């Protein structure tokens, strides 16, 4: 049974497919939206998702993942990832690689990996807020793209929900930090645990205050 969509919601959703419609009118057929989750946290990976929605599909309530309640975000995640007409790929870059290349480059790597993981190759890519240097595909950077493009919003939901679930798994391995609550972000709870226990293996050594903590430890050894 098709979704019942209010006139107001239909108008909002129509505004969210303007970029996709423009790409379709230019002859592109497989248009991927791409977004990331986890650039700012002190711990855990950065996760990117690429998502290709079928032409004409409107997904009620879809929006920037950060604007959705956990319950709505989880429901939309399940809908997107179980719909055989929706194609998606996920890229995950862990803490060690983030520390090695920096978070910006790690985010690009995660996005490129997400495109590679798609079951089909897109011919056009809409990217949330970043210039993505793909060697073969035209990519359009859209500021606040997760609010302006349905494809990017879908990718943002898949990326965030995937990362949140990973952080809940990490909580079971390192329960003393509260990863299941803050997902690695620098909350008061997280910082208190970090200063009390020190960093665990998934903490980003190149991020402050962890970097400064480790520098002090090294200095104290001399």
UniProtKB/Swiss-Prot annotation:
Give the first-level EC class, as a single word.
hydrolase
Q: Give the cofactors, semicolon-separated.
A: Mn(2+); Mg(2+)
Enzyme Commission designation: 3.1.26.4
Query: What keywords are assigned to this protein?
Result: Cytoplasm, Endonuclease, Hydrolase, Manganese, Metal-binding, Nuclease
The UniProt annotation places a divalent metal cation binding at 35-36, 128
Its predominant location is: cytoplasm
Annotated organism of origin: Protochlamydia amoebophila (strain UWE25)
- What is one term from the GO cellular component aspect held by the record? ribonuclease H2 complex
Per its UniProt record, what PROSITE patterns does this chain match? RNASE_H_2 (PS51975)
- Biological process per Gene Ontology, one example term: mismatch repair
Annotated Gene Ontology MF terms? manganese ion binding; RNA binding; RNA-DNA hybrid ribonuclease activity
Q: Which Gene3D superfamilies match?
A: Ribonuclease H-like superfamily/Ribonuclease H
Family assignment from sequence similarity: Belongs to the RNase HII family.
Give the reaction(s) catalysed: Endonucleolytic cleavage to 5'-phosphomonoester
Sequence ranges assigned to domain RNase H type-2 in this UniProt record:
29-219
InterPro entries per UniProt: RNase_HII (IPR022898), RNase_HII/HIII (IPR001352), RNase_HII/HIII_dom (IPR024567), RNaseH-like_sf (IPR012337), RNaseH_sf (IPR036397)
| General function of this protein | Endonuclease that specifically degrades the RNA of RNA-DNA hybrids.
* Subcellular compartments: Cytoplasm
Could you tell me what this protein is called? Ribonuclease HII
Question: How does the cofactor bind to this protein, according to its record?
Answer: Manganese or magnesium. Binds 1 divalent metal ion per monomer in the absence of substrate. May bind a second metal ion after substrate binding.
